[in-house]
Amino acid sequence: MKFLNMIHFILCINQEKIEKVFERLIHRLHLQADAFTYKTGHNIVKIPIKDIIYFESEDHQIIIHYYTQNEYHKDSFYGLLDHVQKQLKSFQFLRIHKTYLVHHLYVRKYAYDKVYLSTGIELPIAQSKRKEIRAEQFAINRKESV
């Protein structure tokens, strides 16, 4: 009887791990399929979420920084960073500062007061956001390591 309980326990643990792996896989596939859409002038532009590095707010404009076909691009549109953040809530973007919304996939290193992106760019973390960013970073890393 104990042997059957052990097998059941092992299967349950493995089932949890398998479910988490599938969740991560689905999330990544979801990332590849989804795009961020915005209007600039008379054009409507669609950028794959996976290509977006970060958003920057300047006056009433949002500057979107992204890579596509191994080239760095930036574009701008009118809007609020709060609205962009809500729109991308399920895609692991971190609001590190009132002017920056960073895609977690492009963060190479977190320091106390800044993030280092894989593109070589350094962005400041607002003092009021440091504790929250560390907690979010820990949660994301924990999800990815399971």
PLM regions and their residue ranges:
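Output/docking surface of receiver
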Residues: 1-18
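Short, surface-exposed, low-complexity cationic segments
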Residues: 134-136
